Amino acid sequence: MAGHSQFKNIMHRKGRVDAVRSKVFSKLAREITVAAKLGTPDPSMNPRLRAAILAARAENMPKDNIERAIKKAVGGDGENYEEIRYEGYGPGGAALIVEAQTDNRNRTASDVRSAFTKSGGSLAETGAVAFMFDRVGVIAFAPDVADADTMLEAAIEAGADDVRSDTEGHEVICAQDAYGDVSKALEGRFGEPRRTGLIWKAQNTIDVDDETGEKLIRLVEVIEDQDDVQNVYVNFALSEALVEKMGA
């Protein structure tokens, strides 16, 4: 989780100007609509929709925006989005997985390929790097819901594989097929999590020097700036000095 979490921390520290925030809201709304279309518009019966709503709340997305995105799915309005996964390499041989939702596969493929190329990376064939990652569930809680030992005990008892606790909170990792049961057990005990969902977790992370790290950060930023891209997962770890520098 190191690389992915480090990069997200950098983006949060940088803050978001209105234009970027609008793009974030647009992507969150798209995920809410897609999740509601694929399942039920009731988040209590649709784990993916519930995760999307939690993500939207974490970004302070207005309640009206969330409700409109759900209604769009219920009313059958809007585009039908196809979910696509891209894989590629960045500077230093780092591996990246890109998740996108698109109504035009050719446009998105071209945009993602261009983003890789412009920033010193290369788009690869499907399956080229996925074997370096595991599909896992993640449930994150605020630090004050429990101490580290209590969270670890509860998570292991629920069937989780790992827990990382620090001053920022608790992050519980579990196998994809155990995600539903683990989520239900932990939420029943500790309440609503900060965020939850399925992610791609690197099996191992590679350390990169700061020069390469800056190039990789720029690559991820360019990819995430594409309208159709929802998530980017990486397998590199940055030095703490670079994290502080880029997040300042």
Curated annotation (Swiss-Prot):
A cellular component annotation (GO) from this entry: cytosol
Keyword Acetylation on entry: no
UniProt subcellular location: Cytoplasm
The organism's place on the tree of life at top rank: Bacteria
Biological processes, Gene Ontology terms: regulation of DNA-templated transcription
This protein's UniProt keywords: Cytoplasm, DNA-binding, Transcription, Transcription regulation
InterPro entries assigned to the protein according to its UniProt record, in alphabetical order: Integrase-like_N (IPR017856), TACO1_YebC-like_2nd/3rd_dom (IPR048300), TACO1_YebC_N (IPR049083), Transcrip_reg_TACO1-like (IPR002876), Transcrip_reg_TACO1-like_dom3 (IPR026564), YebC-like (IPR029072)
Molecular function as annotated in GO: DNA binding
UniProt cross-references to HAMAP family, sorted A to Z: Transcrip_reg_TACO1 (MF_00693)
Similarity remark: Belongs to the TACO1 family.
Protein name as catalogued: Probable transcriptional regulatory protein Mchl_0946
